[in-house]
Design a protein with these regions (language model features):
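A short hydrophobic/small-residue beta-strand
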Residues: 187-189, 367, 452
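Conserved C-terminal structural/oligomerization subdomain of aldehyde/semialdehyde dehydrogenase
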Residues: 46-49, 237, 275, 330, ...
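Glycine-rich loop-to-alpha-helix module at the N-terminal edge of alpha/beta enzyme cores
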Residues: 45-138
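Short, well-ordered beta-strand elements within core beta-sheets of diverse protein domains
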Residues: 47-54, 71-76, 163, 274-278, ...
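Residue-level signal for inorganic ion chemistry
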Residues: 45, 83, 105, 128, ...
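Terminal low-complexity tails and localization/encapsulation signals of metabolic enzymes
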Residues: 1-51, 85-89, 139-162, 265-268, ...
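ALDH superfamily catalytic-core signature
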Residues: 247-392, 455
């Protein structure tokens, strides 16, 4: 591809002729469902097609296919190297269809097509390649024993995995689930989010082109209350992994308790603090990054830096720069390659966010910029980038995960107060610290209860490091070789031969 391939494509024209997936992918086949549902694009609120809408019965069929593929099929019995080779081919096929998949992501959930192409698809391709590489790198153990005895500790695939994924990164987060599960030798039933069914259905079709055996990766749509619940309660599901809200995560724990006690891994909400101290190495960079951390992906990120905690000595300077930076994040047409920020995912999200904003203002919050729906004649749920201050500790804009481009700013007097304010949340997904003092960086990082802490940066990382949270942000880890442990069982084999 050229130096700016994304800019060279007429994405709107391509969207007009883009075919949509026509079936659920179950047992290696594209299948219809008993009903369909319109796909509404947040780009302009228009209907772009129909998608088959799965029921609990369809989920049963998908689980049965995954169960057969695990119990009697070749996938768990392949040499791990061979599974890795299939995942590498899978990555190549996805790469060949990168434009198509980026367009589907942009259409279904409003992500700017450049971000879909350069971030979302890059992440999925790298995830497939990473787990293709490490599939045969996990070793067992031989532990010390007495004469005439041998003990073996091996990792075996856990079985059928149900993955329930969100709409905000419909391929990135799905890949973080199904790629390590497949590498470990499991079979998968993945339920798409209601708002973003298209891209993952197409990826499942491409998996078959890459040589994944039938029944190994099954993808269904459907309502969470019906299909998600059925997967959570299904006795033939061995592991359930979920990314989404804390409220829904609680349901999955109940479903497990009421069924077969399947293992459950949860990556849930966040209200991540971004702390800037006076000795930050570059206040301009800190301010620009603070804006990026909340306005990227329209703030629809579980790790969004939604709470900016500023030391009083530099609060005015940094806040002025953040407000200026916010004005540069202009929501636009997601199919325009120059757009940095698109709409919210749907009108329901817009209504919820506006209600939360109004409640926050009624409780004393001051809107410094934004705080309104963009009303310039365009269709679609476009929200202006928003910065608010003057927040009491119990203000809804400080306490709740908004999943929107809304930055809440709090001023503190010292390090202890910064840590206390940062920790005054039920969540513990991520945090950031800006300081030139290595001692302070390490000290504050240790004191913050979060799955990831960034120092002098935000949202940096790699597939080689794990991702997940603590407290109400969940448990279990995506990414890295550590994720393979979530989809495998440890077995001890003790042999007496003397």
């Amino acid at each position: 591809m050229g130096t700016d391939h994304v800019a060279s494509v007429d994405w709107a024209a391509r969207a007009a002729r883009q075919p949509l997936p026509s079936g659920l992918v179950i047992d290696g086949e594209s299948r219809g469902a008993s009903s369909t549902r319109p796909v509404v694009t947040p780009r302009d609120g228009g209907t772009i097609g129909q998608v088959p809408w799965a029921s609990a019965q369809d989920a049963d069929v998908a689980v049965a296919a995954a169960r057969r593929a695990f119990d009697t099929g070749p996938w768990p019995r392949l040499h791990p190297r061979e599974r890795g080779e299939v995942l590498q081919r899978f990555a190549e096929v996805v790469e060949a269809h990168r434009d198509e998949l980026a367009l589907l992501v942009s259409l279904e959930m409003g992500k700017p097509v450049r971000v879909a192409h350069e971030v979302e698809l890059r992440a999925l391709i790298r995830t497939l390649r990473f787990y293709g590489e490490v599939a045969d790198k996990e070793n067992g153990e031989i532990t010390p024993t007495g004469e005439g005895e041998l003990s073996l500790v091996t990792r075996e695939p856990a079985g059928v995995v149900a993955a329930v994924v969100p709409w905000n990164f419909p391929l990135t987060l799905a890949g973080w689930k199904f790629a390590p599960a497949l590498a470990a030798g499991c079979t998968v039933v993945l339920k798409t989010a209601e708002q973003s069914p298209l891209s993952m259905l197409r990826v499942a079709e491409l998996a078959l082109e890459a040589g994944l055996p039938r029944g190994v990766l099954n993808v269904v749509t459907g309502d969470g209350a019906e299909v998600g619940r059925r997967l959570g309660e299904h006795p033939d599901v061995d592991v359930l992994t979920f990314t989404g809200s804390t409220a829904v995560g609680r349901h999955f724990l109940r479903y497990s308790a009421d069924s077969n006690l399947k293992r459950v891994y949860l990556e849930l909400g966040g209200k991540s603090p971004n702390i800037v101290f006076p000795d930050a190495p570059d206040l301009e960079a800190a301010a620009a990054t603070a804006a990026w951390a909340i306005f990227f992906n329209s703030g629809e990120m579980c790790t969004a830096g939604s709470r900016l905690i500023l030391h009083r000595d530099i609060a005015e300077e940094v806040l002025e720069r953040v407000v200026a930076a916010a004005t540069a994040w202009v929501p636009g047409d997601p199919l325009d390659p120059s757009t940095r920020m698109g709409p919210l995912v749907d009108e329901r999200s817009m209504s919820r966010v506006i209600s939360q904003l109004e409640a926050g203002v009624d409780a004393g919050a001051e809107v410094l910029v934004g705080g309104r729906r963009i009303d310039d004649g365009r269709e679609g749920p476009y929200l202006a980038p928003t910065v608010v201050s003057g927040l009491a500790p119990d203000n809804v804009l400080v306490r709740e995960e908004l999943f929107a481009p809304i930055l809440s700013v709090v001023t503190v007097d010292d390090e202890d107060e910064a840590v206390r304010v940062a920790g005054d949340t039920p969540y513990g997904l991520a945090a950031a610290v800006w300081t030139s003092d290595l001692g302070r960086a390490l000290r504050v990082s240790r004191r913050l209860r979060a799955g990831t802490v960034w120092v002098n940066c935000y949202e940096e990382g790699d597939l080689s490091v794990p991702f997940g949270g603590v407290k109400l942000s969940g448990f279990g880890r995506d990414k890295s070789r550590h994720a393979l442990a979530e989809y495998s069982d440890l077995k001890t084999t003790w042999i007496s031969y003397g």
